[in-house]
Design a protein with these regions (language model features):
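Rossmann-like NAD(P) dinucleotide-binding subdomain of oxidoreductase/dehydrogenase enzymes
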Residues: 100-165
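N-terminal Rossmann-like NAD(P)+-binding subdomain of aldehyde/semialdehyde dehydrogenases
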Residues: 1-110
Length: 165
């Protein structure tokens, strides 16, 4: 994760980070189900292990926001999204058969879900945990790598995400 609020060298930093992530995605074949589960499990553990720190960071960004509100509206839905994704991931990865026109018989057609490589996520300030982890969960489930840009209006949460990444 890039945690920059200055525009001075941010393009260079982003280009370097993207180059590393893109190169890694090109050298790795499509992530297996086990690898995707490992990434999702790591994200789940990160969220559970740092729940208090995340609530404190969000509260600092908002001036004060109730820990209960952050848990109820950001952390618990993120954990539920991770659980749902892990439960259905194997089915989502399977090829889907599609009908073939009579003209192309005896051919077969199917859609094979494949990762695209690197996903950029630009996160808003109002629900910084939930609105970052939802797309990040989807990117990891699809087998992609991701770059996450947190809002400059949530600096404490962005700094914590950068530390934990």
């Amino acid at each position: 994760m890039i945690n920059r609020t200055s525009l001075i060298d941010s393009k260079t930093v982003l280009d370097e980070a993207f180059s590393r992530i893109h190169a890694a995605s090109r050298h790795e074949h499509a992530a297996s189900l086990a690898v995707r589960h490992q990434r999702l499990d790591a994200l789940d553990a990160l969220l559970r292990d740092n729940m208090v720190r995340l609530c404190e960071a969000v509260s600092a960004d908002f001036g004060h926001r109730s820990t209960h509100e952050t848990r109820l509206l950001e952390i618990f839905p993120s954990l539920e999204g991770l659980r749902h994704t892990r439960r259905h991931l194997a089915r989502w990865m399977k090829p889907e058969k599609r009908p073939v026109s009579l003209w192309f018989q005896p051919g077969r057609a199917e859609i094979r879900p494949q990762p695209l490589g690197c996903v950029g996520i630009i996160n808003p300030w109002n629900y910084p945990i939930f609105l970052a982890l939802g797309p990040l969960t989807a990117a990891f489930a699809a087998g992609n790598r991701s770059m996450l840009k947190m809002s400059e209006l949530s600096p404490s949460t962005a700094a914590l995400f950068a530390e934990l990444a």
